[in-house]
Amino acid sequence: MIILASHSPRRQELLKRIVPDFESHPASINERALPVLDPPAYVQSLATAKGQSLVPSYPGATIIAADTMVAFQGKLLGKPHDRAEAKQMITALGGQTHQVYTGLWVRLDNGSVRQQVVTTDVTFWPLSEADVESYLAEDAYQDKAGAYGIQDAGALLVKSIQGDFYNVMGLPSSTLYRMLLAEPQ
């Protein structure tokens, strides 16, 4: 049995490409209770907490947990609370390079645990006020770290990426695939 510690439609879609048969169960953790560390350490601690919270309910299962955050100039950009916050984020990212971090935590059915943080650099085009307003009108910023989804209207903001495209979507598939292999890495 494989458990994905998330109800994210994007993560489910990406995991189906690797593992066609799994169950999705969100982890119930208090993210605010965890100390905010540097971005890579923070996403790893969140993924670990999510995964570990499901171990008692699924002791013999393979559990996959992930957490993705956007960081710009050392500051974490989570999901915007409203349109105004999304506008601030997108405006700040215009013409700049930022990082997308995903912490992965995998507990295999044999009990071994694997962890990894994947980083992707994303560069946005310079954005005019009209560009930002046009993007915000799509409402594609909702429920997205950094106020954009590269698989949606946010793709029009992106000039280039360096690293794993699927990491920006929330689940670095090729890295996860290798973590799921039975052999040590």
From Swiss-Prot:
It comes from the Bacteria. Its main location: cytoplasm. SUPFAM superfamilies: ITPase-like. Its cofactor is a divalent metal cation. Pfam families: Maf. The record marks R10, T68, Q151 as: Important for substrate specificity. GO terms for molecular function: dTTP diphosphatase activity; UTP diphosphatase activity. This is dTTP/UTP pyrophosphatase. The keyword Hydrolase applies. Its EC number is 3.6.1.9. The keyword Cytoplasm applies. It comes from Lacticaseibacillus paracasei (strain ATCC 334 / BCRC 17002 / CCUG 31169 / CIP 107868 / KCTC 3260 / NRRL B-441). It catalyses: dTTP + H2O = dTMP + diphosphate + H(+); UTP + H2O = UMP + diphosphate + H(+). It is found in: Cytoplasm. Nucleoside triphosphate pyrophosphatase that hydrolyzes dTTP and UTP. May have a dual role in cell division arrest and in preventing the incorporation of modified nucleotides into cellular nucleic acids. The active site is at D67. Belongs to the Maf family. YhdE subfamily. Keywords: Cytoplasm, Hydrolase, Nucleotide metabolism. GO terms for biological process: nucleotide metabolic process. One of its GO terms (cellular component) is cytoplasm. The lineage of its organism: Bacteria, Bacillati, Bacillota, Bacilli, Lactobacillales.
